Amino acid sequence: MQAACWYVLLLLQPTVYLVTCANLTNGGKSELLKSGGSKSTLKHIWTESSKDLSISRLLSQTFRGKENDTDLDLRYDTPEPYSEQDLWDWLRNSTDLQEPRPRAKRRPIVKTGKFKKMFGWGDFHSNIKTVKLNLLITGKIVDHGNGTFSVYFRHNSTGQGNVSVSLVPPTKIVEFDLAQQTVIDAKDSKSFNCRIEYEKVDKATKNTLCNYDPSKTCYQEQTQSHVSWLCSKPFKVICIYISFYSTDYKLVQKVCPDYNYHSDTPYFPSG
């Protein structure tokens, strides 16, 4: 003999609390445990994806066939079934909530200051034309990014003359005295550390028409040379010093590249 009592407590909140109590006789078991078990019934209920689940439906299927053991009358209204599109939308929304937040894209590491701008062959050139000489000098500067840089020169000349191309500090005085061209002050030598790394000179001779008199044939010498300097810090600014001497023409020129273009550190000349 068993007795079961059910109480429904209606509170102010829109939640229904269901309280059950059961008295079992000796050796007896709950009628709920005898009839199929709640585990399999609940599993069957929660796996139905085409019907809405409610507390009334859950209790009505769990206690089906047990009308004599309870005085609780639960009304069940047939829910409005979901469409297939609604189910797919629900699955998609639940999946989106479980996906981890995407990582912010990292910016690529850019090393600044390692490679500076370079002067190409077209950035520096010197073209000298006289009656007896045709001269073209081109150069470029390359910063290796490791504290050193190289200066390259190409020299092409046809005719007779004496050409000298060298690197000097900005304080080098422009003058025609040959003895002063290779002298560097002691204070400048500390901030000017350059040496010749490579040098090559090719010469050839040929007889061509003279520039001053096309009716005559003149002996002309063709010279092609390549030279490179390797400079290392500490240094401030280097200048290119060109001196040219011939029987009818004399030229001395000092060219200092725009160091503000070549380096991140501005250079302000003094003196």
UniProtKB/Swiss-Prot annotation:
User: Where is this chain's protein located in or outside the cell?
Assistant: Secreted
- The segment annotated V (Cys-rich) runs over 186-271
Annotated Gene Ontology cellular components are: extracellular region
How is it modified post-translationally?
May be proteolytically processed at the boundary between the N-terminal non-conserved and the central conserved domain in neuron-like cells.
Chain positions covered by the region annotation II: 22-97
Q: Which residues form a coiled coil?
A: none
Gene Ontology molecular functions = signaling receptor binding
Q: Which UniProt keywords apply?
A: Glycoprotein, Secreted, Signal
Where are the glycosylation sites?
23, 68, 93, 146, 156, 162
Signal peptide range equals 1-21
Q: Which domain of life is it from?
A: Eukaryota
Q: Where is this region: IV (linker domain)?
A: 177-185
* Keyword Glycoprotein attached: yes
A Pfam family per the record: Neurexophilin
The job of this chain, per UniProt, is described as: May be signaling molecules that resemble neuropeptides. Ligand for alpha-neurexins.
Q: Which family does it belong to?
A: Belongs to the neurexophilin family.
Q: What is this protein called?
A: Neurexophilin-1
For this protein's source organism, the top of the classification is: Eukaryota, Metazoa, Chordata, Craniata, Vertebrata
